[in-house]
Amino acid sequence: MPNIEADRVTSIPENNDRKPKSQPLRNNLHDTVKSYSIRDAATANIGPPAERHYPWGCPVTHTKEKFYTICADYAFLNQATSLCKSSSSVCSSSSEDKSALSNTINYIDLQTSESDSACNEDASLDSLSGSLGTRPLAWEIDTSDFSTMTTRLKSRSGVNKQTPKKKTERKAKPLRDCPQHLILDDVKQRKVLDLRRWYCISRPQYKTSCGISSLVSCWNFLYSTLGAGSLPPITQEEALHILGFQPPFEEIRFGPFTGNTTLMRWFRQINDHYHVKGCSYVLYKPHGKNKTAGETAVGALSKLTQGLKEDSTAYIYHCQNHYFCPIGFEATPAKASKAYRGQLFPHEVEYWILIGEPSRKHPTIHCKKWTDIVTDLNTQNPEYFDIRHPERGLQYRKTKKVGGNLHCLLAFQRLSWQRFGPWPLQLGNLRPEPQPPIQGRRIPKSESEDNVSKKQHGRLGRSFSAGFQQELAWKRMCNIRERRGSGSPESDTDCEGND
């Protein structure tokens, strides 16, 4: 193999001797290429990479080392031919251009001034290719192995591209089951919130007046124009005046004498004052006095949700140290794919109850799980569950009493004349008589309690039950003035004592 670097180094100081050396180079060119055939290249000694000096850095792509030397030599010849061709086209340029060209390729000593030399070199290369015949040259390297590798890579990349498509198709299959059109009526049955109930919430309350504030909220929804009635709405102050209380109302401690039956009695007194009809009863109370025997949590939930869809029933929830009013609910599906489904089974949804808050120190609307409410109603002394702070879990109160629970759901219902049905009732007995002015905070008699027979009491609902009869006896024995100094038998601890 000719030493190209040696020729290049010797050619630099001897610029004047280019013409005599160019002719031997052309004569030996054909012999040099012949000497490096493929058979001889297989036995060629290839040194380490540090000892190789290839002037043109031939881009050899074949993996077999036996072609490295041949590729380097033939690449040099190929580059030399291209330089000779380019030099013949610019022979008419200025001498400065010739010097610049010679500086850029200073490691090749070729005669570029004569055009016939380039033609002779082209002819010698043509004769070289003809003499080699079918022997592969540097630019004729077999790349069949590379084509097979590229096809494999393409096939693998195609497989990789197809796999995510299959995954997306699998993920998209469940989405096809979702309904395309929203069934509005069915969704309305699962999400119920009558804004009139919220409008009627008496907020804020007086200190420890959550019981009477919740009762006023229910009454306004049932009978006032603010809700579903036709009477003007009443305020807490008007209701307290009807019940015999006098200002300042901030100084009244309602907690000791405000209980479940107390609220039911006050509801009837306000109805008698405004000459309207209604009834009240305990919807769900699993433990303690006046418990709803035989009522289950599922049945109570069904009645509660059905009543919240109507405008003839209002509710009060007695929880830990507080009263407030359920105003709506949402039945949330357990699966995201059923968010807009129509009718769902009860086991496929989870119920949340929206509760209006009369206290200004808490959010205006609570959203509590029905399961948490059931937990609260089913705990017994000394255990209790604060529904407004469910994160605290079960707690224990300091009391000697064991068993029982005052927490419950109370229902207040507006009655119409059609509710009495075809029973042979005299309208005179049902029409309230004029009431004398309230003096000395005396509780007026209710004609609905005294003039209706016991048989008719059994037909009018739960407000005329054994608990109702006990309430009558209690009303005859006590008045409001006497009860202000002593606690009610069903009174809880100070209602909203922290407000």
Swiss-Prot record:
UniProt keyword Cytoplasm, yes or no: yes
Compartment list: Cytoplasm; Nucleus
Biased composition (Polar residues): 153-162
Compositional bias per record (Basic and acidic residues), positions renumbered to this chain: 444-453
Segments for region (Disordered): 1-29, 153-172, 428-465
Keywords: Cytoplasm, Nucleus
The organism's place on the tree of life at top rank: Eukaryota
Main subcellular location: cytoplasm
GO cellular component terms given for this protein: cytoplasm; nucleus
Similarity comment text for this entry: Belongs to the BIVM family.
PANTHER family attached to this UniProt entry: BASIC IMMUNOGLOBULIN-LIKE VARIABLE MOTIF-CONTAINING PROTEIN (PTHR16171:SF13), DNA REPAIR PROTEIN COMPLEMENTING XP-G CELLS-RELATED (PTHR16171)
Name of the protein this chain belongs to: Basic immunoglobulin-like variable motif-containing protein
Species of provenance: Xenopus tropicalis
Gene: bivm
